[in-house]
């Protein structure tokens, strides 16, 4: 992925409780929460049955499906995010996992309009929300930002 996406310095993936069941539903995230708007028109869905990625070829298929997006939902597997650095990739991953949980809990949620989702996304990007989420976690769990950078 990092070879294909030269703008990405870091990638984050992990199998979490909210991500795996959501990924098994085989659908993209929708802008149903403020956090979800950050991924509006900026994530992909990898519809492949090779859930145990064991080859360079499978990794390349994921990279191709990811395209220029910052995140991808991997069918029946979980999530993957990329970023300009560790804070963006990890912060984005945690936020996307929360978005997946919201989708599982709010089954009848009505998505925001594309215009509202784009506006929220632009504002959150201006605030560097993924980076902020990462440093909030570091401050809470580690305390020393220099220990993780």
Which role fits each region the language model picked out?
Residues 21, 34, 38, 42, ...:
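Alpha-helical context
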Residues 1, 50-62, 111-123:
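Noncatalytic linker/hinge segments flanking ATPase motor cores
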Residues 1-19, 56, 60-62, 68:
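Short HxH-centered metal-ligating active-site micro-motif
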Residues 70-149:
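A conserved C-terminal secondary-structure "cap"
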Residues 40-94:
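A contiguous pocket-lining binding segment that forms or flanks enzyme active sites
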Residues 1-11, 29-45, 137-143:
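Charged, low-complexity, helix/coiled-coil-prone segments
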Residues 14-54, 58:
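Class I SAM-dependent methyltransferase SAM-binding "motif I" and its flanking Rossmann-like core
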């Amino acid at each position: 992925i990092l070879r294909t996406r030269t703008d990405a310095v870091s990638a984050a993936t992990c199998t979490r409780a909210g991500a795996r069941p959501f990924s098994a539903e085989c659908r993209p995230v929708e802008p149903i929460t403020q956090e979800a708007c950050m991924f509006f028109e900026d994530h992909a869905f990898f519809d492949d049955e090779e859930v145990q990625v064991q080859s360079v070829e499978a990794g390349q298929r994921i990279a191709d499906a990811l395209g220029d997006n910052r995140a991808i939902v991997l069918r029946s597997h979980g999530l993957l995010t990329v970023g300009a650095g560790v804070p963006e990739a990890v912060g984005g991953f945690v936020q996307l996992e929360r978005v997946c949980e919201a989708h599982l809990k709010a089954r009848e949620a009505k998505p925001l309009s594309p215009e509202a989702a784009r506006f929220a996304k632009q504002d959150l990007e201006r605030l560097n929300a993924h980076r902020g989420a990462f440093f909030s976690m570091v401050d809470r769990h580690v305390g020393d930002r220099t220990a993780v950078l």
